[in-house]
Design a protein with these regions (language model features):
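Active-site-adjacent structural segments surrounding the nucleophilic cysteine of cysteine proteases
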Residues: 1-54
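Cys-His-centered catalytic/binding microenvironment captured across papain-like cysteine peptidases
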Residues: 1-6, 14, 120-146
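Generic hydrophobic/packing signal
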Residues: 24-29, 33, 81, 125, ...
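Conserved active-site-adjacent core of cysteine acyl-enzyme catalytic domains
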Residues: 48-137
Length: 146
């Protein structure tokens, strides 16, 4: 996963993961790859697939519309939730290539399709190459309403 550096407000990315689930206290942790980084399929479609694989979303009906509705509820204020950037998902390009690591600057105000996006740079320790990337931050969501 990633290690948080509080003094720099950055995430040092150690490796990539597409999802991590925490069953305690009804908290779900999910990270979604940016659609543009991995092909033609969009963010919501990828998120729907991710949730379906873990049994959170049943996959019936129109995935995109249902997931948009879920996101709107989570960010709309009707449901109390706690959001923290606790992990990072590098795009498929970085994940498939050894030697890459990254530092992502958390920008909580940046919203893409209703999901916080993290912008950062990646560095290849093998050849010194740098590359910019956009990531969707991991969300730590408490869905328990109050």
């Amino acid at each position: 996963m990633a290690r948080y550096s509080s003094d720099l407000n950055t995430w040092v990315v150690r490796d990539s993961t597409s999802a991590r689930l925490d069953g305690d206290c009804g908290i779900i942790t999910l990270a979604v790859l940016c659609g543009a980084a991995t092909g033609s399929r969009g963010v919501y479609e990828k998120a729907a697939d991710l949730l379906t694989r873990h049994g959170i979303y049943d996959g019936t009906g129109t995935k995109v519309l249902k997931l948009k509705s879920l996101m709107q509820k989570m960010f709309g204020g009707g449901t109390r939730f706690t959001r923290q950037c606790i992990g990072m998902t590098l795009d498929a390009y970085l994940a498939a290539r050894p030697g890459w690591s990254g530092v992502a600057i958390c920008k909580h105000g940046d919203i893409c399709h209703g999901i916080p996006v993290v912008h950062g740079v990646a560095y290849n320790t093998n050849n010194g190459e740098w590359m910019g990337y956009d990531l969707i931050a991991t969300l730590r969501i408490n869905l328990e309403a109050q």
